Swiss-Prot record:
Name of the gene: MDG1
Annotated source species: Saccharomyces cerevisiae (strain YJM789)
Task performed by this protein: Involved in G-protein mediated signal transduction and in the regulation of polarized cell growth in pheromone-induced cells.
PANTHER family per UniProt: 5'-AMP-ACTIVATED PROTEIN KINASE , BETA SUBUNIT, CRUCIFORM DNA-RECOGNIZING PROTEIN 1-RELATED
A GO-annotated cellular component: nucleus
Ranges of Acidic residues composition bias in the record: 233-247
Biased composition (Basic and acidic residues): 265-284
Cross-link (Glycyl lysine isopeptide (Lys-Gly) (interchain with G-Cter in ubiquitin)): 314
Modified-residue entries (Phosphothreonine), positions: 216
Entry-annotated residues carrying Phosphoserine: 160, 288
Protein name: Signal transduction protein MDG1
SUPFAM superfamilies associated with the record: E set domains
Presence of the UniProt keyword Phosphoprotein in the record: yes
Length: 366
């Protein structure tokens, strides 16, 4: 449909690569490119309006980026700026002469000057994008750090779901990735959800329990560290008694042995009674009882020194807590021997042993 407004054809001779027409009709924005004809010249036809017969239509050409007026049209100089213009008479004169040859492309551009020249992007996006959600389970080898896809699931989302779905689940472990679910949106409208689970190898947990420590003594025997006590066996005790008997020889006073036997007979009954009050698990073994007699070698005149030794049971009754056994012994230098420790801490320790006493005491306790 051709416009009822008067039209005018603007021309520029051939030579330039591109020419744009601008003026008061587009507020000098340079939005109307001219059309190049087969001869290489540029022209464009567009409707023009005048408010009064004396009004002017101002315009200018942009030739390869430069603002230039044309010598084929009238020129107006305003504050040093040159612009072309036409009047209503120029439009009537061009129409009467019929000298203007309309180019179909130029006419179409002139009439549709307000129409957008670029196809809107909305038409390109008219087709809806299909949305998918990808669920991946990735397992990580903690030893090598290698990550591999354990399973993958693709789910198509309905149209009701928003394309810009965000992450609602957050979480983080020692390794930085385990136990998290992440949804990543790419440029093509596909939502990708990565569910990362830890790759745990079922290793049996080994709990190291420190058992009771054991130590080895100088004799090669292994004993508990909680009860590191040395006990004498019955055979060792008998050997020591025999050695002591040999050392004593004939120098032992007969009166001393008689007095010792009398004192042992007197204490026989109290010792047996006191043993009844002891707990079975806390009885002192016979083989572990050691007596220590102090010997005085002040005067080797054969005088007898009397010493009192006190033996206390471990947990006896108050009445039988301490019993006294008196033994008379000749004062003479004894054979130096090493002493051994006993497990019963309540028994007093002496550097020497009386063999006859232990032998009879063992018989009494049996």
């Amino acid at each position: 449909m051709q416009s009822s407004l008067p039209q005018f054809t603007f021309k520029w001779p051939k030579g330039p690569e591109a020419i744009i027409l601008t003026g008061t009709f587009d507020d000098w924005k340079g939005t109307l490119p001219m059309v190049k004809d087969p001869s290489g010249a540029f022209e464009i036809t567009l409707p023009v309006t005048f408010d009064s017969p004396s009004s002017k239509f101002y315009f200018k050409f942009i030739v390869d980026g430069q603002w230039l007026p044309s010598k084929d049209y009238k020129v107006n100089i305003d504050e040093g700026v040159e612009n072309n213009f036409i009047t209503e008479e120029d439009v009537i004169k061009q129409r009467e002469n019929g000298s203007s040859t309309l180019v179909p492309e130029s006419t179409g551009l002139a009439v549709s000057k307000n129409a957008p020249l670029i196809e809107p992007e909305a038409e390109k996006r008219a087709k809806k994008l299909r949305k998918f959600k990808i669920k991946r389970v990735i397992k990580t080898n903690k030893q090598t750090g290698e990550r591999s896809i354990f399973s993958q699931e693709v789910v198509e989302l309905p149209d009701s779901e928003d394309e810009t779905q965000q992450v609602n689940k957050t979480g983080k472990n020692a390794d930085g990735l385990s136990g998290t679910t992440t949804i990543i949106e790419n440029n093509v409208g596909v939502n990708e959800e990565k569910a990362i689970k830890p790759y745990e190898e079922n290793h049996p947990k080994v709990n190291l329990v420190k058992s009771e420590g054991y130590v080895t003594d100088g004799l090669g025997k292994t004993q508990s560290s909680e009860s590191r006590l040395y006990e004498l066996s019955a055979e060792d005790l008998e050997k020591e008694e025999e050695e002591e008997d040999e050392d004593k020889g004939g120098g032992k006073d007969t009166s001393t042995s008689a007095d010792a036997e009398a004192s042992e007979d007197q204490n026989k009954e109290p010792l047996s009674k006191s043993a009844k009050f002891e707990k079975p698990e806390e009885k002192v073994p016979v083989s572990s009882i050691t007596s220590h007699a102090k010997e005085t070698s002040v005067k080797p005149t054969g005088k007898v020194a009397t010493e009192t030794q006190t033996y206390e049971t471990k947990q006896g009754a108050p009445t039988a807590a301490a019993k006294k056994i008196e033994a008379k012994k000749a004062t003479r230098p004894s054979k130096p021997k090493g002493t051994k420790e006993t497990p019963n801490k309540g028994v007093q320790k002496n550097p020497a042993k009386n063999g006859g006493f232990f032998k009879k005491l063992a018989q009494l306790l049996k």
